[in-house]
Amino acid sequence: MRQQLATAARHAWAVSPLGQGIESYDGLPAEILYDEPHRQLRRYCPETRVPAGRPVLLVPPLAVSTRCYDLRPGQSLAAHLVGSGRATYVIDYGAITFADREMGFEDWIDDILATAIMTANAASGGHGVDVVGWSLGGTMSLLTAASHPRLPIASLTAFGTPFDYTLIPAVQPLLTIDRLLGTRRAMTLTGAMGGVPRHLVRASYRAMAPRRELTKALHLARNILDVEALARTEAIDDFIGSMPGYPGRAYHQLHSRLMARNELAEGTVRLTQDREVRLRDITTRVLLVGSATDNIANGPAVEAGTQVIPGARYVAADGLSHLGLVAGPKAPMLSWPSLDVFLGQ
């Protein structure tokens, strides 16, 4: 009993704001292929095996760090892919500030992702790249593939990428405000701030999982002797704490085009008056993975993509949360196997 009390006290101090944390994880080693503002491309270093097969490019969402793919030991999709013998790349957007307020979807579609795909392809033998995106990272990847069908994209997998925003309960308050005020007025505050600052992004992400936030203290108390449970909670908190902000133009496009007008569900996104991106122009194989228990992009909202992308296939990984689709402790059993099969085809 005395030893348990000592362990509990040590763990309680470690998870407190003054503590050093339960688990120290610096991430997988990686080499930088190029490093420019909002576009750093890294290749994870294999431990022993020589990479074989097509390379994989991991695309994070806007306003999310690359930690989503390398959360911690056992919850790292990047480590899983590297361990399977694939050359694995990740594109990092870095910090987003007020100075970046003019960055829009076009910057990702025409430059950031297109350049990353071509570079990864050239660095790995030129046989095509398997692109994997999570959440809005999947959206940007799909819009890139539709806009540039000649890019060397061998396949595209999107985890938790919503298409029909009318099916997502968490988005409905924003849509109600938009209907009452109109898009221009609804966007006044974010326009003045040059986007969505990182602190607001982090608070919004936490608000979309209220049960987790309300019960976190009780969860920590109940598991104060369980190092693994504490480390998982700590990793998620660190991940949320690393979220950058949304640039103004990109958030305006997200709000007005994807949410308010629900254009992805229609299959055509109108970036400007002169430019439309049609999902039917995607020529590569597409896999959509979703979960009925995802509070941010539930299964039906993700599966709606099969109605607008030619040949797209949907796979359910029910029981996983939004982040859990790519980095949950059950992802190796529920969602990663579908990716492995798809990449092997």
List each model region and its residues.
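Catalytic histidine-centered segment of alpha/beta-hydrolase-like enzymes
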Residues: 296-299, 314, 320-334
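Conserved loop-alpha-helix segment in the C-terminal half of the alpha/beta-hydrolase fold
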Residues: 292-313
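Alpha/beta-hydrolase-fold enzymes
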Residues: 122, 126, 141-249
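Short beta-strand immediately N-terminal to the catalytic nucleophile in serine-hydrolase-like folds
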Residues: 131-133, 159, 289
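Short, surface-exposed "cap/lid" segments of acyl-processing enzymes
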Residues: 19, 26-97
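Alpha/beta-hydrolase active-site loop
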Residues: 102-123
